[in-house]
Amino acid sequence: MNSFGKRLIMTTFGESHGKAIGCVLDGVPAGLDIDETFIQNELDRRRPGKSKFATARKELDEVQILSGVFEGRSTGTPIAMVIFNKDQKSRDYSNIKDIFRPGHADFTYWHKYGIRDYRGGGRSSARETAARVAAGAVAKLLLKEFGIEVEAGVCEVAGIEAKEFDFDYAKTSEIFALDPYVETLQKEAILKAKEAHDSVGGAVLVRATNLPVGLGEPIYYKLDAVLAEALMSINAAKAVDIGLGREASRLYGSQNNDQITKEGFISNNAGGILGGISNGEDVIAKVWFKPTPSIFQKQRSIDVNGNEVEVELKGRHDPFVAARGSVVAEAMMALVIADMLLLNATSQLSHLKKVYL
Amino acid sequence: MNSFGKRLIMTTFGESHGKAIGCVLDGVPAGLDIDETFIQNELDRRRPGKSKFATARKELDEVQILSGVFEGRSTGTPIAMVIFNKDQKSRDYSNIKDIFRPGHADFTYWHKYGIRDYRGGGRSSARETAARVAAGAVAKLLLKEFGIEVEAGVCEVAGIEAKEFDFDYAKTSEIFALDPYVETLQKEAILKAKEAHDSVGGAVLVRATNLPVGLGEPIYYKLDAVLAEALMSINAAKAVDIGLGREASRLYGSQNNDQITKEGFISNNAGGILGGISNGEDVIAKVWFKPTPSIFQKQRSIDVNGNEVEVELKGRHDPFVAARGSVVAEAMMALVIADMLLLNATSQLSHLKKVYL
Amino acid sequence: MNSFGKRLIMTTFGESHGKAIGCVLDGVPAGLDIDETFIQNELDRRRPGKSKFATARKELDEVQILSGVFEGRSTGTPIAMVIFNKDQKSRDYSNIKDIFRPGHADFTYWHKYGIRDYRGGGRSSARETAARVAAGAVAKLLLKEFGIEVEAGVCEVAGIEAKEFDFDYAKTSEIFALDPYVETLQKEAILKAKEAHDSVGGAVLVRATNLPVGLGEPIYYKLDAVLAEALMSINAAKAVDIGLGREASRLYGSQNNDQITKEGFISNNAGGILGGISNGEDVIAKVWFKPTPSIFQKQRSIDVNGNEVEVELKGRHDPFVAARGSVVAEAMMALVIADMLLLNATSQLSHLKKVYL
Amino acid sequence: MNSFGKRLIMTTFGESHGKAIGCVLDGVPAGLDIDETFIQNELDRRRPGKSKFATARKELDEVQILSGVFEGRSTGTPIAMVIFNKDQKSRDYSNIKDIFRPGHADFTYWHKYGIRDYRGGGRSSARETAARVAAGAVAKLLLKEFGIEVEAGVCEVAGIEAKEFDFDYAKTSEIFALDPYVETLQKEAILKAKEAHDSVGGAVLVRATNLPVGLGEPIYYKLDAVLAEALMSINAAKAVDIGLGREASRLYGSQNNDQITKEGFISNNAGGILGGISNGEDVIAKVWFKPTPSIFQKQRSIDVNGNEVEVELKGRHDPFVAARGSVVAEAMMALVIADMLLLNATSQLSHLKKVYL
């Protein structure tokens, strides 16, 4: 259950403080230029330890491609990528060995598996998302061949909403903020929480541009449904909107419907998806992250024996996870769209005839 | 791509105005009492034509079980269920044969497949959800064996929010309203929109109670992620929250974390899921529906040849889809949880030993 | 676990003496002409009750298409087909209700599920293969668009081997014999066994012609491996050969290797598959069927309570199942190749560019 | 398409002369003791370079576990294992860079993908099977907990058949011969072929003992069908028999049926499988390997430009692949049975109740 996708299938493995994390990406068409620098750059964007807004854990996150690439191009065989863990201060975690940190997966992993790798959250750590970013980078390379681009940025921090959405600006922002005008306020909110040994939540806007019409496989592999799954699978995600999302439910049909002219859709309230299929407009989704559960205040909890304890965490944690989450959201959307691109290639007999006849 | 689930796999088929719709449910453990009356009752709850708040289309939605049940019990083989379409006024749709209705899947199906069954939306019609309700009813029967119950109701109509959540009341309400105190206002909003030939949106709260700890398969079959997919796959759904959802992103970590005592979790902001795995609390999700796209006002659109047209729909449509959507949301959550129950049965070696040794 | 295929996915349902059997075929590209007469003809070829060489059970096997076809063409949505059971003499089976027939699945179904639909073997009956033939017929229609043809015939009965392989002749033979010169002997062997209340086994040769190079997905969806699975899943199948099969293992490498010239491969010992991928030559497989387990002699067995019993079957059974098995083998090979055709459409970036750019 | 299994899912990656080969094994229940020495020993059994009967390529095949194991036990998360390639004499292959070796996958990979990693066969090399053996070793550890054992050995070399099947003896034989009395003849046949720069084929018998009744998921995940797929997916495999296999087709039903007494089945012609489900008897399968295609004689072929060439291979190759193939066959059968064990855990409601209630 550690695989994602139907035709472009990512399988990830690895624990926060194990030997390595990594992924196997199966289904990449042969003949794609695999730009390793680009992949590494994507990982560097997600990498912790770069600013005071994120965890101080310093991982170089150097990715190695083990297979599937020959002379710079994909061969059609699975692309395995591995990142060996370096900065694994496992000692930091010895004190929480038998304790369930509130808001964390400790409690559920323990009960589900009867055992847990407690070091840094083990498999449940957001560190796993580095593997997704590596796979997502390959998906982006594939999408680029078709002119499709996926971008993301932070649109809300602690309730402070972006009014403008400048995806280029986000690329340069330490917190991937989409709106330069509220970025300062947003940063202050993060630092204020950090100083109070607390954390804040936020939201990320993800956008794909230049999609062909037709991506998405009704009824149970709809583009919007799979995007929802993909984004909700990111650590700390608690809500997903497609297009106007929740806001659409407060409009009248006559307001919300995207009417059509010769030039295309007049509006894009739908977020580029109708009936689970892309309509050619920008695909827009929003994912909402809870505040980081790792805070440095005393909290009530229990240990594995059911005894009540007071937890006070040590270690290094992001006071705001949505920033790095935006890089992961991009990766997930890229993977979803690339998968849908492959799936849709056989939707019509005429497509197949172009390939074979 | 018309299948859902990994161990309990529902495959649906059928078009709104074709011969029949139906489903095949594979993976139901043998020995389950299959109460056909219960299944039919579930379908009756979703069935249109019962009140002025829903479409006047009258379908008896009589379900026939074709296989997988012998002498009242499941045999472990696939359970096929079929509902023959009766009230198919296909003529109603001849006028939109070549036209793309705004807000509908007409445009995307046409482009994706190069052909569409235009009668009543064909496969993209919400009629398909009757098949889900039939399958969901079987999932509910399975869950009942373990004391797990899934319930849903409407918590918001046209921005009018429920303050109380009375799931028993919802069962008796024509619009499945959770809050009797706002129900009248909510109904008025629907009727007002209907009279204006318009439609409204809303939201549904779904809840599962009495789950064991451990359901959900990280990393890519997380309970919350799959719920998000399941709920977003319902027609007209545009957003999904788990637990506090979006609201959680506006709290501090110290507020949002569910602390733990000997008696259990102090709060349930997480909606019963940590790290993608059920924690034993109620699983809570919310799904937001856009206003019905089928409205009876003039709208701009184009036809299949790219000519601009004015669309004015006829036919019978719900002015508010979330009510019947709540029955579907229940079915989808039941299917997800039942699937997770089966999957989790092999999470520990000790579980397997209970089965085999 | 009642589904087969990855992109062209057949799900079957139904029991021998239940209400109906049928299938849902998902993934058929839109725009394919669906010739219902052809589908019915395929079913008629498999249909029992036509000669003294097969069971006297008379089923009309009238197939109804419930979905996925509009105005004679596939729409891209799942094609559901159903065959209602007519001639269900359930009384024939009351005497074996609690008994395990030797060579049958009675024993294993009972133990696996704790319950069994004993009427005519229930789900384990070869009657299920009618659903495969319906789905296979659609696969054949798809393959025909690419000039690919799948044919089969009986090449051995009770050890009497065909020396010639005339697939056209097989179409006219009551036992689908490939070799007219040994057909009489083969028929005599069947009738002799039948008279002795016994049964015989045999083998079927299946061939696909005119495949493109490239079908088959290494490493775990190889064309030969999936063919082996497909053919071995047919009732009573006990062995599968690809190309020379077992005989190849008794040659030297220098004899067995298919050398290549400008004109193509000099020989086809490989059966058209190298490394799990089609090489453009005819794909050849052989499937070996055990003698029908249903014989009308006294046999030792036990009942569900563990008591020893003497079984003496009544009812109607084929004395030789491979004949009708050859129709099923064709269907299975057609399904496999069609699935591979769809999968291979995304093997190269250049293929995708043909579809999208 | 590089994954195998439904609940115990092995994904392999890597090329013969790339950086590494490896696998990710997902679905291993938590709490299993992972004996790394045992896994390494299994790899050592398959490892080349140990005798004159196998290729001289010397790989240490040192396996590293990267994830999924904590303090010696499985945690329920994916177990990634990697083997870095050491002895990669890529130069050996430069002369066949543009040439299709007869009997190899060069031709088909080239055409399927438009590119190939020609070094040592790339992905199509039998080197990939080392990853299977690693995964299979974990499956064996799981099966051992339930008393199930899987063993294999060579039963035929160049037409020389074993008459006795001594699985313990096979463990000590350089060619994994099952029958000590014909082993010398079999070895001579291999060496004689080797001296003639040729190769021979053979067959392997695989056996699983002590299975519970009930493993196998009809209709399309039958134990025998999936075994056939698993064994046929091994490099150079061309035929698979279950139980008596082909021989059964030459018996009468009255001879072939395994009659039953209180003490169990009187015979085991079926190879332990009825209706696709294990019946508690030994599961028996045979897999037939073609002679190694890599021979050191002149052969006719073409190059990537279609020019006719004479190929004369250099490099190091097994003159007889079935010996090492027997280790792989064991691994594949272990994986299949372990997967079926997990799947069957939910076949009955009563099983689930044992886990949850």
From Swiss-Prot, chains A, B, C, D:
Which pathway features in its UniProt record?
Metabolic intermediate biosynthesis; chorismate biosynthesis; chorismate from D-erythrose 4-phosphate and phosphoenolpyruvate: step 7/7
* A cellular component term, taken from the record's GO annotations: cytosol
TM regions (residue ranges): none
Keyword Nucleus among record annotations: no
What is a biological process (GO) this protein takes part in? aromatic amino acid family biosynthetic process
Q: What's one Pfam family here?
A: Chorismate_synt
Entry-linked Gene3D superfamilies: Chorismate synthase AroC
Its EC number(s): 4.2.3.5
User: Cofactor binding mode, per the note?
Assistant: Reduced FMN (FMNH(2)).
Entries under PROSITE patterns matching the protein: CHORISMATE_SYNTHASE_1, CHORISMATE_SYNTHASE_2
Reaction(s) catalysed by this chain's protein: 5-O-(1-carboxyvinyl)-3-phosphoshikimate = chorismate + phosphate
Q: Which residues does the annotation say bind FMN?
A: R123, S124, S125, N235, A236, G275, K290, P291, T292, P293, S294, R316
Cofactors named for this entry: FMNH2
User: Any idea which UniProt keywords this protein has?
Assistant: Amino-acid biosynthesis, Aromatic amino acid biosynthesis, FAD, Flavoprotein, FMN, Lyase, NADP
- Sites binding NADP(+) sit at R46
- In the record, what terms sit under GO molecular function? chorismate synthase activity; FMN binding
Class of enzymatic activity (EC top level): lyase
Keyword Zinc on entry: no
Functional note: This reaction introduces a second double bond into the aromatic ring system.
Subunit structure, per the record? Homotetramer.
Family annotation (NCBIfam families): aroC, PRK05382.1
Membership in a protein family: Belongs to the chorismate synthase family.
The record's listing under HAMAP family reads:
Chorismate_synth
Q: What is this protein called?
A: Chorismate synthase
Record organism: Nitratiruptor sp. (strain SB155-2)
Q: What is the lineage of its organism?
A: Bacteria, Pseudomonadati, Campylobacterota, Epsilonproteobacteria, Nautiliales
Gene that encodes it: aroC
